Amino acid sequence: MAFNMDPKKCPMPTQDPNVRNKNFKEVALGYTEEMAVNEAKRCVHCKNKPCQTGCPVGIDIPEFIGHVAEGDFEAAYQVINRSSSLPAVCGRVCPQESQCEGKCTRGIKNEPVGIGRLERFVADWHRENVHTAPIVPEWNGHKVAIIGAGPAGLTAAGDLAKLGYKVTVYEALHVAGGVLMYGIPEFRLPKAIVQQEIDGLKKMGVDFECNMVIGKVLTIDELMGEYGYEAVFVGSGAGLPRFMGIPGESLKGVYSANEFLTRSNLMKAYLPTSKTPIRTGKKVAVVGGGNVAMDAARSALRLGAESVYIVYRRGMAELPARKEEVEHAEEEGIIFKTLCNPVEIHANDEGFVKSITCIEMELGEPDASGRRRPIEKKGSEFELEVDTVIMSLGTSPNPLIRSTTPGLETNKHGCIVTEGDEGKTSREGVYAGGDAVTGAATVIKAMGAGKAAAKAMDEYIQNK
């Protein structure tokens, strides 16, 4: 097979920025078969597979890419499926540039192989062309409970179901999917794709119980007692939003990004018929610089805002959001106001937001995170006229489970403490992973944690 030594990735087809910023259809349109084969041929098949070491779920990347290069897309899918329960999701939202693609040998001098784009292509091809029913393993006589139907919980559920366990997933919201459903907008991750992955788990025998808030409706002690579950995995995520603590944060027109995106993505609160309408102003400020901030800003634009600002206390080079998401936001007309930070939010006579006061920042020496610390420039305050403020400053785990589970150790941030990478908690038979342990992180890291915990839970039950 001849290698493709083109220094650049095959470009991803996308909607025109001036069209897509007015709709919620997916921005990236995906590779054609020809594009996928050509991109796959850029892989030089390193013997030590550095890309695989960068994948939290350990996909054999050179093997699946080799099958793509040969045009055997179903074989490629089977390789991915051995390690990942959500390939169509990961191909779209994982930060490949800092994981698998960040370790690609081609990336030393040129652009790395488009691993994420190829994973997405393979998953989409399989979904559109293969319609066989999944194999349902014989029940092994044991049953386990999963708390939370996000990426960690779904992965743990899938891996345990494959091993023959009777798995029940308890989800607090009215639909399964967790952050994949409520947090990531349709234009980045179509909900039909997530639903299909969930439907696949149901066909494998996984039961989903929605509207079940563990810690209120049932406790972990009850699940492991009268309900007879031999082990429990806590993948309840981190849905408690953080705020700045500045004057005016309680005004009408101030949202957490978590609330704004949940009501937009899951509840369709922007529709005129909504019973819980969301107010979208004409001038919107989103405070923060991560992927969630980009999602909130781009959603606000699509919901009718005329001007949307990203207000971030560091510079463009320090933005934690994926480079691709920043580029898409810029193309769509999002205005970046960097090196400034809000200090107060002001109200009009009716109690709605009318403006924010910001102060300019400069970067000093690196802080504990390794990034240069932002320092206020005295006397540099200025006012920005906005009518909506969305705070995107991160999230913490909800305290409900830890407060209703005696003996479950958590740290000062409210995250569940686990041993090593296996997810074992201070309570026997209770495992945890994903954002409930790490705080807000990536989808693929949560999946990796769910995978590791599922293996540990199996070993625990089989050795009891």
Where are these regions (language model features)?
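Feature captures the FAD/FMN-dependent oxidoreductase FAD-binding
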Residues: 75, 138, 143-147, 195-246, ...
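A conserved FAD-binding loop/helix module that cradles the flavin
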Residues: 436-462
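Ferredoxin-type iron-sulfur electron-transfer modules in oxidoreductases and energy-metabolism complexes
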Residues: 20-38, 59-92, 109-138, 264-265
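Glycine-rich dinucleotide-binding loop and its adjacent helix/turn
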Residues: 122-138, 196-216, 241-303, 411-421, ...
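Local cysteine-cluster metal-coordination motifs and their immediate loop/turn environment
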Residues: 41-63, 85-108
